[in-house]
Amino acid sequence: MKLTTSVGILGYGAYVPFYRVKGSEISRIWSGEDEPVREKSVPGLDEDSLTMACEAAREALEMANVKREEVGALLVGSESPPYAVKPSATVIAEALGLTPRVVAIDMEFACKAGTTAAILVAGLIAGGAIKHGLAVGTDNAQARPGDELDYTAGAGAAALLLSREVESAVALIEYAYSYVTDTPDFWRREGERFPRHTFRFTGAPAYFHHIVGAAKGLMEEAGFKPSDFDYVVFHQPNVRFPLRAAQMLGFKEEQVKLGLVCGEIGNTYAAASLIGLVRVLDHARPGQRILVVSFGSGAGSDAICLVTTENVGRKKSSLERLLSKKVYVDYAQYAKQKGLLKVA
């Protein structure tokens, strides 16, 4: 899908809690041998997907420096909202001063909800319905203690302030391509606390099939090849999968490394690929092309192609500071902060 009207990123932001638990600490408790990430982010006792989304969206708004009343949409993608019935988007919109005249909605498509939010906001702008819009991906990822996901399920948020005022944009969205199938690789039924997954089924039939399908689809439709991109950001459930996907598609490791942050913060689910994009935008130079490919279980992938403008680099997010600001906790404190310890 090529946007018929130019849509740009005026501002962007990210939030990562400063608590960390090391993979070796999780292995110590559960006698695991594999550590898919070095460490992962852990939310504070007063943090959840809603509060993290507020922080990321506030940073994007401040970078964009737009009037709050001109932001016409706020789409929040997450699979871990704090309320089963009550939208996060209205709370965030109120906290940011966007209410009452704003389209605000919660969205869910596992780990690709954030990129889908961005595509829909871009569509509203390109269609002339709104001037500016916010797309947010945020998650406090859940995992059963001792499960494979317990090693990687992190916490974080990222936000994009999209606009038709492209002369001030740091990057322009050129193309978007979505690829979905009914693939039951990961799910959580109503009333269940933790998600379930078919571990071996999450690789080839799910992650790689959809990532490759979306990336190839966009490149074929737009006439691009891997060498046309300076950076590529894949959804990152662990460190290995994005590197393998890059190899399968013909990308080089140096195109992937900058946006690969899961080794430091774990899998932040709906925020994962967007946090990777934030890091790339913080370091990119004008005229560089970026490919972002998300993945959400169930299953599907969004591929988004962007090109940076001369404005990139003039302002940067707080991501590098957040990545370096760490307080390590042991497994007991981690379990307490994640709400894994229940008192009868």
State where each predicted segment sits:
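Condensing-enzyme catalytic core mediating Claisen C-C bond formation in acyl metabolism
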Residues: 1-47, 147-205, 209, 213, ...
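Buried hydrophobic positions in well-ordered alpha/beta secondary-structure cores of metabolic enzymes
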Residues: 9-11, 60, 71-74, 92, ...
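A structural motif shared across PLP-dependent enzymes of the aminotransferase-like
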Residues: 18-29, 51, 80-91
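Claisen-condensing/thiolase-fold acyl-transfer catalytic domains that form or cleave C-C bonds
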Residues: 50, 54, 80-81, 99-101, ...
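Phosphate/pyrophosphate-binding loops at sites that engage ATP/ADP/AMP, CoA/4′-phosphopantetheine
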Residues: 56-72, 212-230, 249, 284
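Membrane helical hairpin/interfacial module
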Residues: 68-94, 99-102
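Short beta-strand segments
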Residues: 77, 133-139, 162, 174, ...
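Flexible, glycine-rich active-site loops centered on histidine and acidic residues
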Residues: 126-159
